[in-house]
């Protein structure tokens, strides 16, 4: 069974989320529903089990929680945060940073 790579985008408001999702769109992965608050983001992490999280805005607490619960998840942010794997200085860097991330491997159980 093939398993597509899933990416969760989180931003502070719907307009920023739309822009981030557009910047993160690529044929190599599937975007999950995005979130604009921590509660929804954590719910999506639990439900969708994304491989990567892209968080633009003040999401240090979310990044720390996700890193603690899912140490292997790739996390891209727009500012330095404990637990972030990469920092994008602009929306234009998001795709390249996601492409540089690890891919899931092994059987799906």
Go through the PLM ranges and name each one.
Residues 25-32, 41:
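A generic structural motif
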Residues 1-23, 64, 80-82, 89-109:
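Non-catalytic signal-transmission and effector/linker regions of two-component phosphorelay proteins
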Residues 36-52:
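Acidic, metal-coordinating helix/loop segments flanking the phosphotransfer/catalytic sites
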Residues 59-72:
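Short amphipathic alpha-helix used as the core "switch/output" element in two-component signaling
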Residues 35-36, 89:
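Short beta-to-alpha connector loops in regulatory alpha/beta signaling domains
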């Amino acid at each position: 069974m093939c398993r597509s790579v899933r990416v969760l985008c989180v931003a502070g408001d719907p307009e920023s989320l739309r822009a981030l999702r557009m910047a993160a769109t690529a044929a190599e992965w599937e975007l999950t529903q995005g979130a604009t608050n921590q509660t929804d983001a954590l719910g999506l992490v639990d439900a969708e089990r994304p491989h990567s999280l892209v968080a633009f805005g003040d999401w240090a607490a979310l990044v720390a929680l996700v890193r603690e619960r899912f140490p292997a998840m790739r996390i891209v942010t727009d500012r330095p945060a404990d637990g972030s794997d990469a920092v994008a200085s602009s929306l234009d860097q998001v795709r390249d940073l996601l492409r540089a991330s690890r891919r899931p491997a092994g059987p799906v159980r």
